[in-house]
Curated annotation (Swiss-Prot):
<keyword id="KW-0997">Cell inner membrane</keyword>
<dbReference type="GO" id="GO:0005524">
    <property type="term" value="F:ATP binding"/>
</dbReference>
<dbReference type="GO" id="GO:0016887">
    <property type="term" value="F:ATP hydrolysis activity"/>
</dbReference>
<feature type="binding site">
    <location>
        <begin position="37"/>
        <end position="44"/>
    </location>
    <ligand>
        <name>ATP</name>
    </ligand>
</feature>
<dbReference type="GO" id="GO:0005886">
    <property type="term" value="C:plasma membrane"/>
</dbReference>
<dbReference type="InterPro" id="IPR003439">
    <property type="entry name" value="ABC_transporter-like_ATP-bd"/>
</dbReference>
<dbReference type="InterPro" id="IPR050153">
    <property type="entry name" value="Metal_Ion_Import_ABC"/>
</dbReference>
<dbReference type="GO" id="GO:0010043">
    <property type="term" value="P:response to zinc ion"/>
</dbReference>
<keyword id="KW-1003">Cell membrane</keyword>
<protein>
    <recommendedName>
        <fullName>Zinc import ATP-binding protein ZnuC</fullName>
        <ecNumber>7.2.2.20</ecNumber>
    </recommendedName>
</protein>
<keyword id="KW-0813">Transport</keyword>
<feature type="domain" description="ABC transporter">
    <location>
        <begin position="5"/>
        <end position="220"/>
    </location>
</feature>
<keyword id="KW-1278">Translocase</keyword>
<dbReference type="InterPro" id="IPR003593">
    <property type="entry name" value="AAA+_ATPase"/>
</dbReference>
<keyword id="KW-0862">Zinc</keyword>
<keyword id="KW-0406">Ion transport</keyword>
<dbReference type="InterPro" id="IPR027417">
    <property type="entry name" value="P-loop_NTPase"/>
</dbReference>
């Protein structure tokens, strides 16, 4: 597998306060990787390091020359007094001049929203549009920061199914920040549990047995995951 990004001994601190300590891992091609951890664990900071938005105080980051990254932020703020349609929003990207908007919207099942105004979209619809925009440069790494925030339960299920479908069709890696442990169990190839340092990492089955993971998330969640049953007959490949 291709190593898209490798982090080695990453340390980040702000005003003398440690945010991330001794972070080392590689993001490999064609996988779904989920980043979990409590509030204040440094997840958003780690995402910014991966995206190159902030530089670590210590450590090395190695990026494959073949890497192409798409990013869906946790929230998007825009001025409601400046109405903008989905089509115009998609065309704001500087990455490509000639964009087949309809084709990309069809990929995320949002073609009916092409001429809708952003401020009229539901939470789930907005996430699909952000996802479509992240796909504009055909990324081999897609970074999704809490993609189901503000989305109702049915919308979350649809969005997770879409994410898995995109991974399969595009053969890209997807790094997701998520609190949904059931999704982690069902769809993820690799889990990184963060609490300013990497508490544990590995397959979901391995991570969920880790004592530090249990101390963070509590036995209640572990019992819920223990009764999780696959509703299919295939074998996960890691």
């Amino acid at each position: 597998m291709l190593e898209l990004i490798t982090l080695k001994n990453i340390h980040v601190s702000f005003s003398g306060r440690s945010i991330l300590s001794n972070i080392s891992f590689s993001l490999l091609s064609n996988r779904i990787i989920t980043l979990i951890g409590p509030n204040g664990a440094g997840k958003s900071t780690l995402i910014r390091v991966i995206l190159g938005l902030i530089q670590p105080n210590l450590g090395n980051i190695i990026r494959s020359p073949k890497i192409s990254v798409g990013y869906v932020p946790q929230k998007l703020y825009f001025n409601n007094l400046l109405p903008i349609t989905v089509e115009k929003f998609m065309k704001l990207s500087k990455r490509k001049k000639n964009i087949n908007i309809l084709k990309i919207l069809k990929r995320v099942k949002a073609q009916s929203l092409q001429y809708s105004r952003l401020q009229n979209l539901s939470g789930g619809e907005m996430q699909r549009i952000l996802l479509a925009r992240a796909l504009l440069n055909n990324p081999n790494l897609l970074v999704l920061d809490e993609p189901t925030q503000g989305v109702d339960v049915m919308g979350q299920l649809d969005l997770y199914e879409l994410i898995n479908q995109i991974r399969s069709e595009m053969q890209c890696s997807i790094l997701i920040v998520s609190h949904d442990l059931n999704f982690v169990m069902a769809k993820t190839n690799y889990v990184i549990c963060l609490n300013k340092h990497i508490c544990c990492s590995g397959t979901p089955q391995t991570v969920f047995k880790n004592l530090e993971f249990i101390s963070i998330f509590g036995l209640k969640h572990i019992r819920e995951l223990a009764i999780y049953q696959h509703n299919h007959d295939h074998v996960h490949q890691y």
